[in-house]
Structure formats: structure tokens, C-alpha cells
């Protein structure tokens, strides 16, 4: 059976610049506990400004169940509900909601790179950045999932999220570990061409000159998460 990497990005904070570590801990703990019983490896992979991304390595037949459980947990612990309330069973009523990206796993262990963006006044140009990352992955033959869409996206087990969802997520699955540094370097280098975009550590708050966008880049490896910021910084020496 095919397996997939599913990433769900959401703002459940009560502010626009950072997340609550205690809430993140509760969400992560319950998601891991509930999904591990189904044989799904899942964790918070990215924390970018006031957004978190939950990433799962999941068999095709459990995608709907995976998403439903994550949505339940998010609603249980959320401090802010705007993104959650943007979800609708009616496609035409879906508003700004979750960011949803899915890509087929080509590795036995579900290895992937997850890139997450958060905006502070950069809503008008952040989609271009995410689509640029998507294009890099596709150009080099990787399977890519991207949350950017011109119309509402159906999230199995949850409902529809609107096209106006503005903190995109990109998932790129890889076959070999050696693909990680090559792909990460290409993405980092390519994104340097964008003004008002800042590469930050996983977990960083929005500490920029607005308007602008921050992004994190992580490796999701067999359910484990590595923040690629440190490795890229040491290699590039910025």
C-alpha cells in the first residue's frame, strides 16, 4: 500500500507573532499517543511564528482518520480559532483555514523536507515563494505537495479549507538521505532572490521588519525532526 507524508499547518495562537510552548507540548503529546496506536508516525515538524505544522507518515487508507484526529486535538487545545473556524463542509463557505500539503512517500522511512511560511503583512506575495519551492522540487523529479491553491482544497476527514489560507506549507519527499542537503541548499539559495523573506530557526517568533515573511525548513525522517537551519548556516557560513 502507498504511504504519504501529510502536513497540516495551522494558527491556534492567541496572538500574531508566536506560539504557546505549553499548547504545542500538549498537542504533540496527544497526537503522537493517538496516532501511534494506528501505526502512524506524527509530530509537530515546524513552528514558524504563530503557526505550527503537524506532519504524519501515513498509509493511504488511514489519511482520513489521521486528519480527523489531528483536527480534534487542535480544537481541544487551541487558544485561537480563526483557522479552525475557516473549515467548512460546504466548499463555497470555506474561509481562511488550515494549510494542507500531501506527497507520496518514496522512502521506506517517509523521509521528506517540510518548508513552512508565516506572514506578517506579506500575504500578497507569500504564495509566490511557496510555489517557487514547489517548482524546485518538481524540476528535480521529487514528489511535491503544496498548500497553495486558487480554489478551496478538500482535506479528507475534515472538510474544505479556503483558497485565502495565507501561511503555506510545502512537502517534498526524498528517496535517499543524500538528497536532503542537496535539496535544502537549492531551496535556501533560490529563496535568497526574494525580498522581505527571512530564514529562521524552527520555533522562532516573528522578529522582522514588517511587512514580511519568515520560513522554516525541517527534515522529517522516520518520524523524527531535524531543523535544517543550523546545518545550512554552518555550511553556508551566514
Swiss-Prot record:
Source species, domain of life: Archaea
Matching InterPro entries: UCP005278
Family, per entry: To M.thermoautotrophicum MTH564.
Name the record gives this protein: Uncharacterized protein MJ1676
